[in-house]
Amino acid sequence: MSTAFDAGNGKITVPDILGRKTSTPSSPNQSSDRGGSDRRRIVCLTAYDYPTARLLDEAGVDVVLVGDSVGMVVLGYENTLPLTVEEMLHHTRAVRRGVRRALLVADMPYGSFHGDKDEAVRNAVRFVKEAGAEAVKVEGGERRMELIAQMVEAEIPVMGHIGLTPQSLHAFGGFRVQGKTLEAAQQLLRDARAVEAAGAFSIVLESIPRELAARITSELRIPTIGIGAGPECDGQILVLHDMIGLSLGHTPKFARRYANVGEAISHAVAAYAEDVREGRFPADEESYHLSSEVRERLLAIRRS
C-alpha cells in the first residue's frame, strides 16, 4: 500500500486536531459541564501492526498512536521501560503502511529524550523521516518544556502527556492515579500550561481525577485527550488490547471492554486443535485435487 496521502480524501492533519478543540479557555472559577451531544470529540486508539492499523483507519479513528504500550501488550515486557527506539521504529513503520486517513503519532520511548536535547530531536526526526510518523508523543510537563519547544522549532509536531506517565513508573511507585492532592493538582495544572506554552498541539491526560481534567481542558487552547481522566476531555484514547479483551495482564479501571477477542482466539485455537487431532481438518472442500487424467497417469506410474 502506498504511503502517499491525499488531503482531499479526508486526511486528518495536526491543524485538523487543533481545530477540534471543543471549548475556549474559561475563567479559573468557571465550572465545566461539557457533556453536550454536539461535541466532536477526538477518537484515538493504539495500533502496533499493519492489519490492526488498517482496520482502525477504515473504522474512522482520528488519531492512531503507536504507543510504547507495545512493549507490554505485544512484546511481553513487564513495563514500557525496556523498549528501544529501533523497536518503536519497526512498529511505527508497520502501522504507517496501514494508516491513510488518521493522524499517525509515535511514542518517544524511555531514554530517547531524557538526555541531550539535540539527540532527542534527532530521535524524533527518525520517527518522522524513517517511519512516517506525523507527530511524536513526549511524556512529562514543566521539565520537558524546553525539549518540546526545540522539537516544535524543528517542525516536529508534539503531543504532550501528563498525569500518570508510565515511563515514570518507578518514581511514582507504581501505576497510581495522579493529582489527588491539592499540591499535586496544582503541579499538573502547571505542567499542562507548560506543555501548551512549549508549542504542543495536544496533550494526553492519564489517570487523573475527572474534575482536574475538566479544569485543565477548560483552561487550555489545545485539545486534551483523556485516558482515565473523565468525559470532559476533548478526546479519548485507550490501549486497543484493553478495549477488545486481548490484554493478558491487569486491565485498568478506565478501560471499557467492547469485545472479547482473547476469548474468541482461545476458542478458535481449541476447536482447530481438536479438528486436527480427530482428522476433521482439512476436509475435502479444503483440499486440492488432480484431474482424473493426471490421477490415472500417476497411478499407472506407481504400478510400473
Give the location of each predicted region:
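Alpha/beta enzyme core
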Residues: 2-25, 33-292, 297, 301-304
